[in-house]
Amino acid sequence: MPSKSKAGPDTISSLRSVVPEIFDAAQRSATGHRKHAVALHSLQSKCHSVDVENLTGEMAFTQEFIRNLNKVLGIKKREPSADKIVKLVAIFVQVGHEIDAKAKAQRQKHKQKSGDADDVFADPAADDDEEEGDTVTSRFAESLIKYLLQGFQAKEKMTRVRCCQIVAMSVTNLGAIDEELYFELIRKLTERIRDKEASIRVHAAIALARLQSSDDGEASEVNEALLDLMQNDPSAEVRRAVLLNIEKNASTLPFVLERARDVDATNRKCVFVKVMAAIDYRLLSIEDRERLLVAGINDRDSGVKRACVRMVGESWLTFAGQNLLELTAALDVVDSPAAGKVMQALFAAYTEIPENLSFDNDLWETLTPEVAFVIRATLEFFAERHDSDQLDRHMPDGMRLAQMLEAMGAKLESETDDEVRADHEFVVHQLLLIARMSDFPDELGRRAMLTLMRKMLLVPEIPENNIEAVSDIIRKLSVSEQDFVRIMVEVISDVREPMPTEADGMPAERVRIESLLIGIKCLIIIKYLLQRCFDKLNDGSSIYALLTECIVPAVQSSETVLQEFGIECLALCCLLDRSLAVDNVVLFAQAVRQGAGELHAKGLAALLDLALMYGVADLAPALGAPDMLIKILRNELHSSDERTQATAAEGFARLLYAHRIAEPAPILEELLVLYYHPDTTSNDALRQCLAYFFPAFSYMSNENQVLMQQVAVPTVCRLGGVLKQQAGEGQAGATQSQVAHQVVTWSDPRILDAISVMNGTTTAMSSSGLRVAARMNSYAQLGVDALKKTFSATPNTRKVLVQMLNRLSLDDTTPVTHTQQLFVLVRTLAQQELITDMITRNAMVRFEATLLKLLDVENPDDVNLEAWIEEPEMESVFEFVSSLDEDGPDDEDELEGAESAGDDDDDEEDSVRVASDSDVSERHPSEEPVLAGLNLRSRLPASSAVPSRSPMKRARQERLEELTREIDELL
């Protein structure tokens, strides 16, 4: 309510002192903001009462308030005093509306008691204004918003930021404002969410999100603008602002769930901790829950994983009434691939949950999918923690477990409803997983379980995942590997025994299908048998019988599916016998060359596994040429099928890591090119594998890092054309400069040393001065290779290579010989005038200064080149300098696409070709390159003289003069 204290002209005149005092106090501390806001409102009420009819006092207060606010509009971000004033403005508007609301409630209460008719002194006009929301606070808010909207178009970035920030913080407390102003505000904010400054877009998005309303006609347009911003804005902070403030409803929720795969880890974390934690999981479809959990629990960022688990353990479990079974039912455990991971992560984060669980006899007798899943997950949790006490407390004995499995199997066989059968199959699988964790201490239980497992393998329609679990249980129950093989061979023989024939009265097609199904089942059992065998094959092994009777016929079969399983089983056999692998490598190569689909994929996997097991050198001779195996596998790196490409890349990564390739450099270079090539942008499996491989490989040993140093420059050069073309087409991806920076980082021996120290693997030998010098020797050679390539590279690649030199970070441990070689090459490059842009020239000057510092020389003229020429280590560099010819930049090393990447390079190349040999001899002394400083040619002996090369500037000038003469002749 308005203050009853006396107000007059003195109140207006005191504004210039009182308001600044309040602002000054507010910017010093944020603790008294509400007190300052109340003081401002009291002052505003006094000013309002000065001239109620013309609002003179009220306008004076508003003008003084804005005058003081102006002083913070241009202050930079994260300035505490300015941020406190912004907060004061928002609280002041909020306090005003709260006081107005209380006053309105009191008036209504008074009217209800006395009645409007009895109040003869009531002001009808004032009442109407109050009902329509026309109050001192609302008028002030409208004036403030109108003023701030003018700042939305300011040239100064910080003015736009502060105006949007104040609007964003005040917009929720605006109350009812003029409709025209409301739409104007939305229009202006919609413009600001396209501002080039991310901080402005953040505040504009927050304000726009808080103005969402399902009642106005522009709601859909606002939602569309915000959704587009949340999906496509390059700033993670802007996307996060929309994510946290956009209205959550049926139309926006799918887009909110997409942010669980945002490239920014903080945004992904916000989805789980702040957004979805506040939404009842029952409002989501099963598919949405599944996508959300899969994204969270499989996230590479540990913080996002913890956020996902926290959402389930604190929010979803609360919505489920702390009922774990109800929550498990919501996870759809029967069909969910992520439910197991989620439950294990939940138990690990909240250990009190599994520790307080108990499973009575009634629960075991009435197993549902949810109950069986929780029991299995609990036992698995204790098994992974090696908590034998808890495991023994919950684990049933072997005999009882066998009885439950047998009873559930009987239910499964008698059930006809597909949905119920799926539930029973799931329960059986969970019981098998539980049995796999049991130690079977009692002999009776062990025998009963072994008998039951053999029977289960004979069930015609047993799922493949159950075959795998049964194989594990039989292996655990067997006394040795030979005993396990014997049991499984007997089971396979029993499966094949009732092989159907036409004599049984079945149609030929039915006989073929039944025989095919039996053959597939036998091969699946053989696969899991071989995967659990580790002993080398001997002449008396029962596996040879399986090889002859099942595997070889399957490989030779006309049925593609049998060939696929046969190839896989044959590869597993070859892993147990080297001679068998050598004999069959041609078969696997044929599957890769001529096979399609799964046959091709399994043949490729077989070749890669065998190469990793025995080495390429042992297998290659069987193919007729030492490099034939590498050629076959290398062709798969360029397959049009992304899965094949990723498999080949992963296989080569393993081979390189295990040092199984005799000449690894070309393969490593190929993988680097593949990793950065635009054509593999959509191949997430390939890029994820290589993103882990390159740093792991480089920082594993000094030998690997030397290999990375050898291929760094060729990789950068090869990628120049395609990456430039990609940038020209507006596609997102790495630039050539980023590639150069990354390979230099992977080649840095000091990072390897730091990792060795961190892991505690540093030895006296590895840290010795001799070893450090050897590592820096190969690292400096990377710079030599880069400089040599600049003389024949395209202009764009040349710029990247020169800028790459400053990232080498050479120091006192760099061998002097390499420092001298780098200096000679840098001076020669400067003399050739191949570097034309100022940025690259400055980079070369900086690198030259680094070299002079390492050489302990202040002036380039002080370098004694005559002495260097006599050094044997410098011979190769001077020979290279003397071999430089008249050819222009050579882009043969670049991949396809360089021609269409742009015309700039072509122009420069053409200008180089225009100058003739005679032009070189006409050069005057004054035309020597500015950067040369030191005439290298004059100090070389005649045999090592560097042939002069026509500089670009002179070539362009000659070409320009020639064109001018032609134009004059035409005119």
Predicted regions and their residues:
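Long internal repeat-built scaffold domains in very large eukaryotic proteins
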Residues: P2-S81, I85-L88, L284-C550, N635-H638, ...
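Low-complexity, intrinsically disordered regulatory regions
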Residues: D893-G933, R939, R956-L971
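Fungal intrinsically disordered, low-complexity polar regions
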Residues: Q108-D127, S921, E927-V930, L934, ...
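Primarily eukaryotic
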Residues: M1, A126, E191, D195-E197, ...
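Short amphipathic alpha-helical interaction segments
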Residues: A793-T797, T814-H818, N935, L940, ...
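Alpha-solenoid helical repeat scaffolds
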Residues: N54-E64, L73-D264, C270, K274-R282, ...
